[in-house]
Amino acid sequence: MTKTLPKDFIFGGATAAYQAEGATHTDGKGPVAWDKYLEDNYWYTAEPASDFYHKYPVDLELAEEYGVNGIRISIAWSRIFPTGYGEVNEKGVEFYHKLFAECHKRHVEPFVTLHHFDTPEALHSNGDFLNRENIEHFIDYAAFCFEEFPEVNYWTTFNEIGPIGDGQYLVGKFPPGIKYDLAKVFQSHHNMMVSHARAVKLYKDKGYKGEIGVVHALPTKYPYDPENPADVRAAELEDIIHNKFILDATYLGHYSDKTMEGVNHILAENGGELDLRDEDFQALDAAKDLNDFLGINYYMSDWMQAFDGETEIIHNGKGEKGSSKYQIKGVGRRVAPDYVPRTDWDWIIYPEGLYDQIMRVKNDYPNYKKIYITENGLGYKDEFVDNTVYDDGRIDYVKQHLEVLSDAIADGANVKGYFIWSLMDVFSWSNGYEKRYGLFYVDFDTQERYPKKSAHWYKKLAETQVIE
């Protein structure tokens, strides 16, 4: 049976400042940790990315033409405050006013994120969110933006608190490149959730007219053998690291006994302890019912198997299928079932995981209000032929995920929109320019845009709300 989506549904496209803007040192922008980290460790930089800093009128015109009525944008903190605090860079402020005005002119609603992986270098090198002083700097930055940009109706505090801690302190593929430090992972999650909660409370206390929420990446975790209690336990512990810890903070205002039991077990196995303060929980509790929406970023699921051994993680950054490895001491290891397809980057394609994750939020956190799928899409090495890309695989991937999203709505979940990652091709943090996701192909040499087959498909979807 053909499935549909609601008439008032947002059909969006997602971007991020550092992945799209380029212009990394233009008009007074301050450095971020990624600038030097990419130069030192990878074969690419964020210059020029998609040159969104100059090309945004083109991208927004394409968005309007192809039925995209919402766009995820992030503000580069170091464009506003080059060192993270102190003196305001007026040219940066002016850029975002012009960008938001163009969005409204094109009838593309901007959903604006304050922090998308790009803490200013001066604060990042000073401990990033492990340093509680930087919580205060983030709140000051948020307060400035809320007041300065009343034209923004939808605010997101953070993009993917989970993968920030994971990338910085577990896998080590994000600056500062620390590996296997689970205590830092949880402390980063916690301090960022406190920052989120305080920003949300500030926004509501000031009486601003818009909506505010947070975007979490929520990869669903399954036991490899659901009949094996040890595999079930491995999936539960992995879920705590990536999902439950931050969801509890968002909607319970504390960590459940089961969550803390898992955290304490993981830290007992791996070392370290957490600094959790009474005032932190007061902040979390004060904001738990104030989130207007939850953004869910979903790309993949994982299957977990019990494992007795040392931690080892190998990140597949070059699309060499089968080269990744993930096992954590005291938690488990990822072992994908043979029947589940995966991408060249070993990302498992499992649309049912999106349905299960949406329903998990609905059932476990009934104060959630509403959900947007804020990122979902398929990255691969697009073949540019005849000024387009015949990306049937991407269309099929998105279609399958929209179908289970439609099922979730039918089963009572309040899902109000979907943002494909990404609107146009952007650079990928740990994969560079080879891995493309966009509806529009970007020639990174000329910065020309070309609609892919998926762009035409998405336009028809947005016009009809029919998934076919």
UniProtKB/Swiss-Prot annotation:
Cite the InterPro entries for this sequence: 6P-beta-galactosidase, Glyco_hydro_1, Glyco_hydro_1_AS, Glyco_hydro_1_N_CS, Glycoside_hydrolase_SF
**GO MF entry, a single one:** beta-glucosidase activity
* GO cellular component entries: cytosol
Question: What metabolic or biological pathway is this protein involved in?
Answer: Carbohydrate metabolism; lactose degradation; D-galactose 6-phosphate and beta-D-glucose from lactose 6-phosphate: step 1/1
Induction section of the entry: By lactose. The operon consists of lacABCDFEGX.
List the GO biological process terms. lactose catabolic process via tagatose-6-phosphate
Q: Which HAMAP family match?
A: LacG (MF_01574)
Which named protein is this? Answer: 6-phospho-beta-galactosidase
